[in-house]
Amino acid sequence: MEALVYVFLLVGTLMVIFFAIFFRDPPRIAK
């Protein structure tokens, strides 16, 4: 069960960084 928590934390951190970059810089890929 500990592995699931670590995976959840990793995905959450990646999503936060991804959205932070997206909101800071508008996406120019495929648009």
UniProtKB/Swiss-Prot annotation:
GO BP field: photosynthesis
GO CC annotation: chloroplast thylakoid membrane; photosystem II reaction center
A Pfam family assignment: PsbT
TM helices/strands, residue ranges: 3-23
Subcellular location: Plastid, Chloroplast thylakoid membrane
Keywords tagged on the record: Chloroplast, Membrane, Photosynthesis, Photosystem II, Plastid, Thylakoid, Transmembrane, Transmembrane helix
Taxonomy, superkingdom: Eukaryota
Record's bilayer topology term: Single-pass membrane protein
Record's subunit section: PSII is composed of 1 copy each of membrane proteins PsbA, PsbB, PsbC, PsbD, PsbE, PsbF, PsbH, PsbI, PsbJ, PsbK, PsbL, PsbM, PsbT, PsbX, PsbY, PsbZ, Psb30/Ycf12, at least 3 peripheral proteins of the oxygen-evolving complex and a large number of cofactors. It forms dimeric complexes.
PANTHER family to which the protein is assigned, alphabetical: PHOTOSYSTEM II REACTION CENTER PROTEIN T, PTHR36411
Function, in words: Found at the monomer-monomer interface of the photosystem II (PS II) dimer, plays a role in assembly and dimerization of PSII. PSII is a light-driven water plastoquinone oxidoreductase, using light energy to abstract electrons from H(2)O, generating a proton gradient subsequently used for ATP formation.
Family to which this protein belongs: Belongs to the PsbT family.
Protein name according to UniProt: Photosystem II reaction center protein T
Organism: Gracilaria tenuistipitata var. liui (Red alga)
